[in-house]
Regions:
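Polytopic transmembrane helical bundles with strong interfacial aromatic enrichment
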Residues: 1-122
Length: 122
């Protein structure tokens, strides 16, 4: 994936995160339990944070930074995506997918750290 495409993906995911945050605050607040709403908000928070991390990875550039961005993308899909589906459908087994997204996030941060060290030493 090119840096430009990765940057665009990060920006789109941030925009979707803002939209989902507004949806949760206005449309779901009266329909969900406090626990489910908190779970939805966690999904939005992690999506926003990692969308920004994707933007940073795209700006840093290099193969490792792009890999980090892809890991963040996978993390958003698995972590936030599974939580959104869990909250909206009530299908409990989706919670088993969430930790895989967390692992992708952790790996992404590690790879981004290596990419940053390499870029700053150059």
């Amino acid at each position: 994936m090119s840096r430009a495409t990765l940057f665009a993906v990060g920006a789109v995911l941030a925009g979707i995160g803002v939209t989902l945050g507004a949806f949760g605050a206005h449309a779901l607040e009266a329909r969900l339990t406090a626990e489910r709403l908190a779970t939805f908000e966690t999904a939005v928070r992690y999506q926003m944070l990692h969308a920004l991390a994707i933007l940073a990875a795209a700006l840093l550039g290099g193969e490792r930074a792009v890999l980090a961005g892809l890991l963040f993308l996978v993390g958003i899909a698995l972590f936030s995506g599974s939580l959104y589906l869990l909250v909206l459908t009530g299908v409990r087994w989706l919670g088993a997918i969430t930790p895989l997204g967390g692992v992708a996030f952790i790996a992404g941060w590690g790879v981004l750290a290596l990419a940053g060290l390499r870029a700053l030493r150059a």
